[in-house]
Amino acid sequence: MMPRYCAAICCKNRRGRNNKDRKLSFYPFPLHDKERLEKWLKNMKRDSWVPSKYQFLCSDHFTPDSLDIRWGIRYLKQTAVPTIFSLPEDNQGKDPSKKKSQKKNLEDEKEVCPKAKSEESFVLNETKKNIVNTNVPPQHPELLHSSSLVKPPAPKTGSIQNNMLTVNLVKQHTGKPESTLETSVYQDTGIGDFHTCFEDLNSTTITLTTSNSESIHQSLETQDVLEVTTNHLANPDFTSNSMEIKSAQENPFLFSTINQTVEELNTSKESVIAIFVPAENSKPSVNSFISTQKETMEMEDIDIEDSLYKDVDYGTEVLQIEHSYCRQDINKEHLWQKVFKLHSKITLLELKEQQTLGRLKSLEALVRQLKQENWLSEENVKIIENHFTTYEVTMI
Protein backbone atom coordinates (compact mmCIF):
# COMPACT_ATOMS: atom_id res chain seq x y z
CA MET A 1 0.00 0.00 0.00
CA MET A 2 1.38 3.38 -1.02
CA PRO A 3 1.86 5.88 1.84
CA ARG A 4 -0.69 8.66 1.85
CA TYR A 5 0.15 12.34 2.02
CA CYS A 6 -1.95 15.50 1.98
CA ALA A 7 -2.46 17.13 -1.44
CA ALA A 8 -3.14 20.62 -0.06
CA ILE A 9 -0.66 23.42 -0.76
CA CYS A 10 1.83 24.11 2.07
CA CYS A 11 0.64 21.02 4.00
CA LYS A 12 3.30 18.37 4.58
CA ASN A 13 1.28 15.90 6.63
CA ARG A 14 1.73 12.30 5.66
CA ARG A 15 1.07 8.95 7.25
CA GLY A 16 3.80 7.78 9.60
CA ARG A 17 5.68 11.10 9.72
CA ASN A 18 3.71 12.93 12.43
CA ASN A 19 3.91 12.58 16.19
CA LYS A 20 2.27 9.63 17.87
CA ASP A 21 0.00 11.82 20.00
CA ARG A 22 -1.52 13.38 16.86
CA LYS A 23 -4.08 11.27 15.04
CA LEU A 24 -4.34 12.08 11.34
CA SER A 25 -6.77 10.58 8.89
CA PHE A 26 -6.80 10.99 5.12
CA TYR A 27 -9.90 11.25 2.95
CA PRO A 28 -10.17 10.96 -0.86
CA PHE A 29 -11.68 13.63 -3.06
CA PRO A 30 -15.39 13.24 -3.91
CA LEU A 31 -14.81 12.54 -7.60
CA HIS A 32 -18.32 11.13 -8.05
CA ASP A 33 -19.99 14.31 -6.67
CA LYS A 34 -19.04 17.20 -8.97
CA GLU A 35 -20.78 19.94 -6.97
CA ARG A 36 -19.05 18.92 -3.77
CA LEU A 37 -15.73 18.54 -5.58
CA GLU A 38 -16.01 22.10 -6.91
CA LYS A 39 -16.50 23.37 -3.35
CA TRP A 40 -13.41 21.48 -2.20
CA LEU A 41 -11.25 22.90 -5.00
CA LYS A 42 -12.65 26.41 -4.54
CA ASN A 43 -11.72 26.43 -0.86
CA MET A 44 -8.27 25.11 -1.78
CA LYS A 45 -7.85 27.98 -4.30
CA ARG A 46 -7.17 25.40 -7.03
CA ASP A 47 -10.25 25.63 -9.24
CA SER A 48 -8.53 24.39 -12.40
CA TRP A 49 -6.82 21.42 -10.73
CA VAL A 50 -8.15 17.90 -11.36
CA PRO A 51 -7.35 15.47 -8.51
CA SER A 52 -7.02 11.72 -8.96
CA LYS A 53 -8.35 8.86 -6.88
CA TYR A 54 -4.88 8.39 -5.35
CA GLN A 55 -4.79 11.89 -3.78
CA PHE A 56 -6.15 12.74 -0.35
CA LEU A 57 -6.76 15.56 2.14
CA CYS A 58 -5.82 15.21 5.79
CA SER A 59 -8.19 15.78 8.70
CA ASP A 60 -6.49 19.08 9.64
CA HIS A 61 -8.44 20.85 6.87
CA PHE A 62 -11.86 19.81 8.20
CA THR A 63 -13.79 21.21 11.16
CA PRO A 64 -14.71 18.80 13.99
CA ASP A 65 -18.39 18.83 13.01
CA SER A 66 -17.44 17.42 9.58
CA LEU A 67 -16.20 14.17 11.15
CA ASP A 68 -18.32 11.36 12.53
CA ILE A 69 -16.61 9.18 15.16
CA ARG A 70 -17.86 5.60 15.37
CA TRP A 71 -16.11 2.87 17.36
CA GLY A 72 -13.01 5.05 17.65
CA ILE A 73 -12.78 5.58 13.87
CA ARG A 74 -13.30 9.00 12.31
CA TYR A 75 -15.52 8.92 9.24
CA LEU A 76 -16.02 11.89 6.93
CA LYS A 77 -19.61 12.97 6.52
CA GLN A 78 -21.13 12.88 3.04
CA THR A 79 -21.72 16.65 3.09
CA ALA A 80 -18.35 17.64 4.60
CA VAL A 81 -16.35 20.39 2.87
CA PRO A 82 -12.77 21.39 3.88
CA THR A 83 -12.51 25.00 5.03
CA ILE A 84 -9.18 25.24 6.88
CA PHE A 85 -6.32 26.11 4.51
CA SER A 86 -3.16 28.21 4.83
CA LEU A 87 -2.22 29.96 1.60
CA PRO A 88 1.43 30.48 0.49
CA GLU A 89 1.06 34.25 0.97
CA ASP A 90 0.15 33.73 4.62
CA ASN A 91 3.09 31.44 5.18
CA GLN A 92 5.47 33.90 3.62
CA GLY A 93 4.07 36.69 5.79
CA LYS A 94 4.39 34.56 8.93
CA ASP A 95 7.87 33.30 8.18
CA PRO A 96 10.10 34.94 10.84
CA SER A 97 13.39 33.88 9.26
CA LYS A 98 12.71 35.81 6.04
CA LYS A 99 11.69 38.93 7.98
CA LYS A 100 14.83 38.77 10.09
CA SER A 101 17.07 38.38 7.03
CA GLN A 102 15.39 41.32 5.25
CA LYS A 103 15.70 43.56 8.31
CA LYS A 104 19.33 42.58 8.74
CA ASN A 105 20.15 43.44 5.11
CA LEU A 106 18.46 46.83 5.44
CA GLU A 107 20.35 47.61 8.64
CA ASP A 108 23.67 46.63 7.04
CA GLU A 109 23.03 48.91 4.07
CA LYS A 110 22.09 51.80 6.37
CA GLU A 111 25.26 51.33 8.41
CA VAL A 112 27.58 51.00 5.41
CA CYS A 113 26.49 54.00 3.33
CA PRO A 114 26.85 56.79 6.00
CA LYS A 115 30.33 55.56 6.90
CA ALA A 116 31.40 55.82 3.28
CA LYS A 117 30.15 59.41 3.04
CA SER A 118 31.95 60.48 6.22
CA GLU A 119 35.22 58.89 5.11
CA GLU A 120 35.03 60.48 1.66
CA SER A 121 34.44 63.97 3.07
CA PHE A 122 37.27 63.59 5.59
CA VAL A 123 39.95 62.43 3.18
CA LEU A 124 39.28 65.12 0.59
CA ASN A 125 40.91 67.68 2.94
CA GLU A 126 44.14 65.69 3.26
CA THR A 127 47.23 66.21 1.09
CA LYS A 128 49.19 62.95 1.11
CA LYS A 129 47.39 60.22 -0.87
CA ASN A 130 48.20 56.82 -2.30
CA ILE A 131 46.13 55.49 -5.21
CA VAL A 132 44.99 51.88 -5.56
CA ASN A 133 43.15 50.98 -8.77
CA THR A 134 40.80 48.02 -8.84
CA ASN A 135 39.16 47.11 -12.14
CA VAL A 136 36.31 44.66 -11.66
CA PRO A 137 34.47 43.48 -14.78
CA PRO A 138 31.15 41.90 -13.78
CA GLN A 139 31.08 38.12 -13.82
CA HIS A 140 27.36 38.03 -14.55
CA PRO A 141 24.86 40.66 -15.72
CA GLU A 142 22.68 39.91 -12.68
CA LEU A 143 25.41 40.27 -10.03
CA LEU A 144 23.77 41.41 -6.78
CA HIS A 145 26.50 41.87 -4.19
CA SER A 146 30.27 41.83 -4.12
CA SER A 147 32.52 42.61 -1.19
CA SER A 148 36.29 42.75 -0.71
CA LEU A 149 38.25 42.54 2.51
CA VAL A 150 41.93 43.47 2.75
CA LYS A 151 43.77 42.48 5.93
CA PRO A 152 47.39 43.71 6.31
CA PRO A 153 49.80 42.47 9.01
CA ALA A 154 49.82 43.36 12.72
CA PRO A 155 49.97 47.07 13.70
CA LYS A 156 53.36 48.76 13.73
CA THR A 157 54.64 52.30 14.25
CA GLY A 158 54.51 54.33 11.11
CA SER A 159 53.51 57.62 9.56
CA ILE A 160 49.95 58.76 8.94
CA GLN A 161 48.96 58.19 5.32
CA ASN A 162 45.86 58.64 3.21
CA ASN A 163 44.96 56.13 0.50
CA MET A 164 42.72 56.77 -2.49
CA LEU A 165 40.79 53.75 -3.72
CA THR A 166 39.33 53.95 -7.23
CA VAL A 167 36.88 51.30 -8.35
CA ASN A 168 36.03 51.09 -12.06
CA LEU A 169 33.00 49.00 -12.95
CA VAL A 170 33.11 48.03 -16.64
CA LYS A 171 30.00 46.52 -18.25
CA GLN A 172 31.01 44.18 -21.07
CA HIS A 173 28.80 43.63 -24.11
CA THR A 174 26.51 46.52 -23.19
CA GLY A 175 26.05 49.93 -24.69
CA LYS A 176 26.18 51.78 -21.36
CA PRO A 177 29.26 53.83 -20.39
CA GLU A 178 31.64 52.85 -17.62
CA SER A 179 30.78 53.82 -14.06
CA THR A 180 33.53 55.01 -11.72
CA LEU A 181 33.52 55.25 -7.94
CA GLU A 182 36.24 57.04 -6.01
CA THR A 183 36.49 56.40 -2.29
CA SER A 184 39.09 57.89 0.01
CA VAL A 185 40.58 55.95 2.88
CA TYR A 186 42.01 57.46 6.03
CA GLN A 187 44.78 55.41 7.55
CA ASP A 188 46.16 55.89 11.04
CA THR A 189 48.98 54.38 13.06
CA GLY A 190 46.39 52.53 15.12
CA ILE A 191 43.36 51.07 13.37
CA GLY A 192 41.81 52.62 10.25
CA ASP A 193 38.83 51.33 8.33
CA PHE A 194 36.51 52.45 5.57
CA HIS A 195 33.21 51.35 4.14
CA THR A 196 31.78 52.32 0.79
CA CYS A 197 28.62 51.45 -1.06
CA PHE A 198 27.89 51.97 -4.76
CA GLU A 199 24.81 51.26 -6.86
CA ASP A 200 24.42 51.77 -10.60
CA LEU A 201 21.36 51.71 -12.89
CA ASN A 202 21.39 47.92 -13.15
CA SER A 203 21.15 47.45 -9.34
CA THR A 204 24.77 46.28 -9.21
CA THR A 205 26.06 46.83 -5.68
CA ILE A 206 29.70 46.72 -4.63
CA THR A 207 30.71 47.01 -0.98
CA LEU A 208 34.33 47.34 0.08
CA THR A 209 35.49 46.91 3.67
CA THR A 210 39.09 47.48 4.68
CA SER A 211 40.73 47.37 8.06
CA ASN A 212 44.38 48.47 8.07
CA SER A 213 46.77 49.05 10.91
CA GLU A 214 49.54 50.36 8.63
CA SER A 215 50.03 51.42 5.05
CA ILE A 216 50.43 49.11 2.06
CA HIS A 217 53.87 50.58 1.61
CA GLN A 218 54.99 49.23 4.99
CA SER A 219 53.42 45.83 4.42
CA LEU A 220 55.36 45.45 1.17
CA GLU A 221 58.51 46.56 2.89
CA THR A 222 58.22 43.86 5.57
CA GLN A 223 57.30 41.22 2.91
CA ASP A 224 54.29 39.94 4.87
CA VAL A 225 51.12 38.25 3.67
CA LEU A 226 48.35 40.14 1.90
CA GLU A 227 44.90 38.55 2.02
CA VAL A 228 42.05 39.42 -0.29
CA THR A 229 38.63 37.91 0.21
CA THR A 230 35.81 38.37 -2.26
CA ASN A 231 32.23 37.20 -1.84
CA HIS A 232 29.80 36.98 -4.73
CA LEU A 233 26.09 36.36 -4.73
CA ALA A 234 24.40 35.69 -8.07
CA ASN A 235 20.65 35.63 -8.53
CA PRO A 236 20.17 32.73 -11.01
CA ASP A 237 22.00 30.08 -9.00
CA PHE A 238 21.47 31.34 -5.45
CA THR A 239 25.12 30.57 -4.68
CA SER A 240 27.70 32.43 -2.63
CA ASN A 241 31.32 32.06 -3.70
CA SER A 242 34.20 32.95 -1.42
CA MET A 243 37.75 33.41 -2.72
CA GLU A 244 40.77 33.85 -0.48
CA ILE A 245 44.14 34.80 -2.00
CA LYS A 246 47.35 34.84 -0.02
CA SER A 247 50.56 36.03 -1.65
CA ALA A 248 54.00 36.28 -0.07
CA GLN A 249 56.91 37.29 -2.27
CA GLU A 250 60.53 37.89 -1.41
CA ASN A 251 61.05 40.92 -3.67
CA PRO A 252 58.83 44.02 -3.83
CA PHE A 253 56.35 43.75 -6.66
CA LEU A 254 54.57 46.26 -8.82
CA PHE A 255 51.25 44.61 -9.64
CA SER A 256 49.42 41.36 -9.04
CA THR A 257 46.65 40.07 -11.25
CA ILE A 258 44.13 37.51 -10.12
CA ASN A 259 42.05 35.56 -12.59
CA GLN A 260 38.99 33.74 -11.44
CA THR A 261 36.60 31.66 -13.57
CA VAL A 262 33.29 30.94 -11.88
CA GLU A 263 31.69 27.88 -13.45
CA GLU A 264 28.68 27.95 -11.11
CA LEU A 265 27.26 31.04 -12.83
CA ASN A 266 26.78 29.07 -16.11
CA THR A 267 28.93 31.38 -18.20
CA SER A 268 31.89 30.63 -20.40
CA LYS A 269 33.43 34.10 -20.02
CA GLU A 270 36.29 34.71 -17.63
CA SER A 271 35.90 37.31 -14.91
CA VAL A 272 39.12 39.08 -13.96
CA ILE A 273 39.77 40.76 -10.61
CA ALA A 274 42.88 42.95 -10.92
CA ILE A 275 44.40 44.45 -7.75
CA PHE A 276 47.28 46.88 -8.35
CA VAL A 277 49.58 47.64 -5.40
CA PRO A 278 52.38 50.28 -5.68
CA ALA A 279 55.88 49.08 -4.86
CA GLU A 280 58.65 50.70 -2.87
CA ASN A 281 60.70 53.45 -4.59
CA SER A 282 58.84 53.06 -7.85
CA LYS A 283 55.82 54.47 -9.66
CA PRO A 284 53.01 52.23 -10.80
CA SER A 285 53.32 51.11 -14.41
CA VAL A 286 50.41 49.52 -16.25
CA ASN A 287 52.59 47.42 -18.57
CA SER A 288 54.56 45.61 -15.82
CA PHE A 289 53.16 42.50 -14.11
CA ILE A 290 54.62 39.71 -11.98
CA SER A 291 53.22 36.19 -12.01
CA THR A 292 51.50 35.08 -8.83
CA GLN A 293 52.43 31.41 -8.67
CA LYS A 294 52.36 31.29 -4.85
CA GLU A 295 48.78 32.48 -4.62
CA THR A 296 46.17 30.01 -3.37
CA MET A 297 42.48 30.20 -4.10
CA GLU A 298 39.77 28.63 -1.98
CA MET A 299 36.22 28.52 -3.28
CA GLU A 300 33.27 27.83 -1.01
CA ASP A 301 29.74 27.36 -2.32
CA ILE A 302 26.83 27.97 0.08
CA ASP A 303 23.29 27.14 -1.14
CA ILE A 304 20.46 29.48 -0.12
CA GLU A 305 17.24 27.53 0.36
CA ASP A 306 13.93 29.09 -0.43
CA SER A 307 10.45 27.92 0.43
CA LEU A 308 9.85 27.01 -3.23
CA TYR A 309 12.92 24.77 -3.30
CA LYS A 310 11.82 23.16 -0.02
CA ASP A 311 8.52 22.22 -1.59
CA VAL A 312 10.28 20.75 -4.62
CA ASP A 313 12.63 18.74 -2.38
CA TYR A 314 9.67 17.47 -0.36
CA GLY A 315 7.92 16.35 -3.56
CA THR A 316 10.97 14.45 -4.79
CA GLU A 317 11.37 12.88 -1.35
CA VAL A 318 7.77 11.62 -1.42
CA LEU A 319 8.26 10.28 -4.95
CA GLN A 320 11.41 8.40 -3.98
CA ILE A 321 9.78 6.89 -0.89
CA GLU A 322 6.62 5.81 -2.67
CA HIS A 323 8.34 4.41 -5.77
CA SER A 324 11.52 2.74 -4.60
CA TYR A 325 12.37 1.54 -8.10
CA CYS A 326 12.63 5.19 -9.23
CA ARG A 327 15.16 6.19 -6.59
CA GLN A 328 18.18 8.00 -7.97
CA ASP A 329 20.69 6.33 -5.64
CA ILE A 330 19.95 2.83 -7.07
CA ASN A 331 21.72 1.76 -10.25
CA LYS A 332 21.00 -1.09 -12.66
CA GLU A 333 23.58 -3.43 -11.13
CA HIS A 334 21.92 -3.19 -7.72
CA LEU A 335 18.52 -3.97 -9.24
CA TRP A 336 19.91 -6.97 -11.17
CA GLN A 337 21.43 -8.31 -7.95
CA LYS A 338 18.01 -8.14 -6.31
CA VAL A 339 16.46 -10.00 -9.26
CA PHE A 340 19.07 -12.78 -9.05
CA LYS A 341 18.47 -13.19 -5.31
CA LEU A 342 14.73 -13.48 -5.86
CA HIS A 343 15.26 -16.10 -8.58
CA SER A 344 17.49 -18.15 -6.30
CA LYS A 345 14.86 -18.06 -3.54
CA ILE A 346 12.17 -19.17 -5.99
CA THR A 347 14.24 -22.16 -7.19
CA LEU A 348 14.93 -23.16 -3.57
CA LEU A 349 11.21 -23.12 -2.75
CA GLU A 350 10.44 -25.20 -5.84
CA LEU A 351 12.97 -27.84 -4.75
CA LYS A 352 11.47 -28.01 -1.27
CA GLU A 353 8.00 -28.39 -2.78
CA GLN A 354 9.14 -31.29 -4.97
CA GLN A 355 10.74 -33.04 -2.00
CA THR A 356 7.56 -32.67 0.07
CA LEU A 357 5.37 -34.01 -2.75
CA GLY A 358 7.70 -37.00 -3.18
CA ARG A 359 7.41 -37.87 0.49
CA LEU A 360 3.62 -37.67 0.39
CA LYS A 361 3.44 -39.90 -2.67
CA SER A 362 5.71 -42.49 -1.07
CA LEU A 363 3.53 -42.56 2.04
CA GLU A 364 0.38 -42.96 -0.06
CA ALA A 365 1.96 -45.89 -1.91
CA LEU A 366 2.91 -47.47 1.41
CA VAL A 367 -0.68 -47.16 2.67
CA ARG A 368 -2.08 -48.76 -0.49
CA GLN A 369 0.38 -51.62 -0.20
CA LEU A 370 -0.60 -52.23 3.41
CA LYS A 371 -4.28 -52.21 2.47
CA GLN A 372 -3.69 -54.81 -0.21
CA GLU A 373 -1.85 -57.05 2.20
CA ASN A 374 -4.58 -56.55 4.87
CA TRP A 375 -2.03 -55.58 7.47
CA LEU A 376 -4.05 -52.56 8.57
CA SER A 377 -7.52 -52.37 9.99
CA GLU A 378 -9.99 -49.73 8.93
CA GLU A 379 -9.53 -47.78 12.15
CA ASN A 380 -5.76 -47.57 11.70
CA VAL A 381 -6.23 -46.47 8.08
CA LYS A 382 -8.50 -43.60 9.18
CA ILE A 383 -5.93 -42.48 11.74
CA ILE A 384 -3.19 -42.45 9.09
CA GLU A 385 -5.42 -40.57 6.61
CA ASN A 386 -6.26 -37.94 9.22
CA HIS A 387 -2.57 -37.56 9.93
CA PHE A 388 -1.84 -37.04 6.22
CA THR A 389 -4.57 -34.42 5.84
CA THR A 390 -3.34 -32.41 8.82
CA TYR A 391 0.21 -32.66 7.49
CA GLU A 392 -0.89 -31.32 4.09
CA VAL A 393 -2.73 -28.42 5.74
CA THR A 394 0.31 -27.44 7.77
CA MET A 395 2.51 -27.58 4.66
CA ILE A 396 0.12 -25.37 2.71
From Swiss-Prot:
PROSITE patterns per UniProt: ZF_THAP
Feature: compositional bias, Basic and acidic residues: 91-113
What's the domain of life for this entry? Eukaryota
Biological process per Gene Ontology, one example term: negative regulation of cell cycle
Please list the coiled coil stretches: 349-382
Q: Does the keyword Coiled coil apply?
A: yes
Q: Where is this motif: HCFC1-binding motif (HBM)?
A: 322-325
| InterPro entries assigned to the protein according to its UniProt record, in alphabetical order | THAP_domain_protein, THAP_Znf
Q: Where in the cell is it found?
A: Nucleus
Q: Which SMART domains match?
A: DM3, THAP
Annotated stretches, region: Disordered: 86-113
Task: Give GO cellular component annotations, separated by semicolons.
Answer: nucleus
Mention any Pfam family matching this sequence: THAP
Entry GO MF terms: DNA binding; zinc ion binding
Its keywords, alphabetically, are: Cell cycle, Coiled coil, DNA-binding, Metal-binding, Nucleus, Repressor, Transcription, Transcription regulation, Zinc, Zinc-finger
Assembly and oligomerization: Interacts with HTRA2; under apoptotic conditions. Interacts with ABRAXAS2.
Q: What does this protein do?
A: Has sequence-specific DNA-binding activity and can function as transcriptional repressor (in vitro). May be a regulator of cell cycle: THAP5 overexpression in human cell lines causes cell cycle arrest at G2/M phase.
Q: Can you say what this protein is called? A: THAP domain-containing protein 5
Species name for this entry? Macaca fascicularis (Crab-eating macaque)
